[in-house]
């Protein structure tokens, strides 16, 4: 649907603020304009339903789902927004790991200045004021878990007066919080609808699921891993984390004084590469026409059957690991625990920045592995005979390892925190 730039920007603003009612009103107005413009040629062109009917399915899916017996395809986010009572009438099949893709990584942020502006509003309820004051009083770097969810709401007028783009509605309904210097990070409650779910995923970790949903019954049907038709060639001499890349560039070896020079050297160990994946910060430095970055990979199918290169170990921010752990009552601060240590992952031993707590380690491995396998999956190796080159010390599935120092001419600092053993 083609939208006017102003309309598109307005919708984007409402969604970012969590103001979904206002967004629905804008979409309804667009629908009315379309409805007024249709004529006989509209249906002669092959259209099977009026714009108003199609829009109503999107805006009010509950009404449609109550009546239909058809197969319905929707996003993870839309599925998680629907009531359990409605979902129970369907056989639900979820494609991909919904816990990783749509729940654990949905961390949000609200600026301290925004919350201070909210406190200036005279219309603010006593409960909301007390909640915000308590959150502002949090010790920096320490997680806080709220025992009851969704009790407090702000009216639209208060949100508009604050002139903030932060999602205050979602913020006050969150489950766990961590104060940082100029903002408060938060993680929405991690909840599944109470009905039967069938989840199909190659990265699903049943232990992680049981940690977050201890009262649910899980039946795991493991399917033997299919051998890749293509190949994964992995170079584990360096983690190529953001910190490692930065340290290599800062070293005294002028051969790699810029990310572009470093990536050019790395690419010399590959062949016929069509696309590259690395961190968003360094994406423009990849000397390739086609690039992607970690965190923005799902659904990309245009590189099926193409050779690709992946540079980096996609570590997540420590506040995300700790917020996730807080939801299952595990408290461990990165200040004292997040260190360079020897770890064991699926029988492979190597060094990386990680936690002492084994459950926190497992959460960290789950997130990193899921993102790396998502990256490898862009070439569709199960059904195409091509090659993905991975430059990371975090082991990928079915990888053939090339154990040598491919930057041996570089004066890499000994403090490389994630170097493989």
Predicted regions and their residues:
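ASCE RecA-like P-loop NTPase motor cores
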Residues: 1-421
């Amino acid at each position: 649907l083609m939208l006017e730039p102003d309309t598109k920007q307005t919708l984007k603003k409402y969604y970012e603020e969590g103001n979904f009612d206002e967004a629905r009103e804008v979409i309804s107005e667009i629908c009315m304009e379309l409805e007024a413009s249709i004529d006989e040629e509209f249906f002669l062109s092959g259209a099977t339903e009026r714009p108003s009917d199609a829009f109503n399915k999107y805006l009010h899916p509950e009404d449609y789902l109550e009546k239909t017996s058809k197969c319905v395809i929707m996003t993870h986010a839309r599925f998680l927004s629907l009531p359990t009572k409605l979902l129970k009438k369907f056989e639900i099949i979820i494609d991909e790991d919904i816990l990783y893709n749509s729940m654990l990584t949905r961390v949000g942020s609200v600026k301290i200045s925004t919350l201070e502006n909210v406190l200036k509003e005279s219309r603010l309820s006593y409960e909301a004021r007390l909640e915000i004051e308590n959150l502002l009083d949090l010790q920096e770097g320490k997680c806080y878990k709220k025992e009851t969810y969704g009790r407090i709401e702000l009216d639209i007028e208060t949100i508009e007066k604050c002139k903030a783009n932060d999602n205050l509605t979602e913020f006050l309904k969150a489950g766990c919080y961590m104060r940082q210097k100029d903002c408060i990070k938060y993680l929405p409650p991690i909840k599944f609808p109470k009905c039967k779910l069938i989840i199909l995923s190659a990265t699903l970790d049943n232990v992680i699921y049981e940690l977050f949903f201890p009262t649910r019954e899980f039946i795991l049907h493991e399917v033997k891993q299919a051998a890749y038709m293509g190949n994964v060639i992995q170079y584990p001499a360096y983690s190529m984390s953001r910190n490692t890349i930065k340290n290599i560039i800062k070293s005294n070896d002028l051969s790699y004084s810029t990310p572009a020079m470093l990536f050019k050297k790395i690419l010399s160990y590959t062949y016929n590469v069509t696309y590259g994946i690395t961190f968003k910060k360094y994406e423009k430095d990849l000397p390739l026409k086609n690039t992607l970055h970690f965190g923005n990979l799902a659904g990309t199918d245009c590189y099926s059957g193409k050779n690709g290169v992946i540079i980096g170990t996609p570590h997540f921010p420590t506040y995300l690991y700790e917020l996730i752990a807080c939801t299952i009552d595990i408290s461990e601060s990165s200040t004292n625990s997040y260190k360079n240590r020897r770890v064991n992952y699926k029988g492979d031993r190597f060094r990386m920045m990680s936690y002492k707590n084994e459950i926190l380690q497992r959460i960290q491995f789950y997130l990193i592995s899921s993102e790396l396998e998502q990256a490898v999956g862009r070439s569709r190796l199960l059904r195409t005979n091509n090659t993905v080159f991975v430059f990371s010390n975090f082991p990928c599935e079915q990888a053939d390892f090339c154990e040598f120092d491919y930057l041996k001419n570089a004066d890499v600092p000994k403090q490389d925190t994630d170097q493989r053993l």
